Regions:
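Nucleotide-activated sugar donor-binding and catalytic core shared by glycosyltransferases
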Residues: 3-135
Length: 135
């Protein structure tokens, strides 16, 4: 909603028409993941999308100067481009030409977090029980 409002506020709508860009209303999580999975490139300032694009293997340009998700830059598909329009255009062109960054899904993003948590909790609980039994 903010992006659409700013496009209208600054009279930039004419830059979007005819450039295969579509402004969508807010999406639910599953709908957004479906859109991301089919994307050739994602430009965002959202931390969550940096993670989702890395998990999906989709190149992501983050239009910020910093990130709370550095693993998406270090190992994933995310590239920080800030607000420098030259860097944004250059990186986007590289990605669209097939020469962009090819990251990987971080090791612990394997879908088994719940199993590891349950195992660690069980181990901790057994330790707590044994500790109480010996006192």
């Amino acid at each position: 909603p903010r992006t659409r409002a700013n496009i209208e506020r600054f009279g930039l709508g004419h830059h979007i028409k005819g450039h295969r860009l579509v402004l969508l209303p807010p999406q639910g999580y599953l709908e957004m993941v479906g859109l991301l999975a089919g994307a050739r490139i994602v430009l965002t300032d959202s931390g969550g999308l940096q993670e989702e694009t890395t998990a999906l293997g989709v190149p992501c340009l983050t239009l910020r100067e910093n990130t709370e998700r550095p693993i998406t830059v270090e190992q994933g598909t995310n590239t920080m481009v800030g607000r420098d329009t030259g860097a944004i255009r250059s990186e986007a062109a590289e990605i669209l030409a097939g020469r962009g960054k090819h990251g990987r899904v971080p090791e612990l993003w394997d879908g088994h977090a719940a199993e590891r948590i349950a195992s660690d909790l069980a181990e901790w609980l057994v330790g707590q029980h044994q500790s109480r039994a010996s006192t």
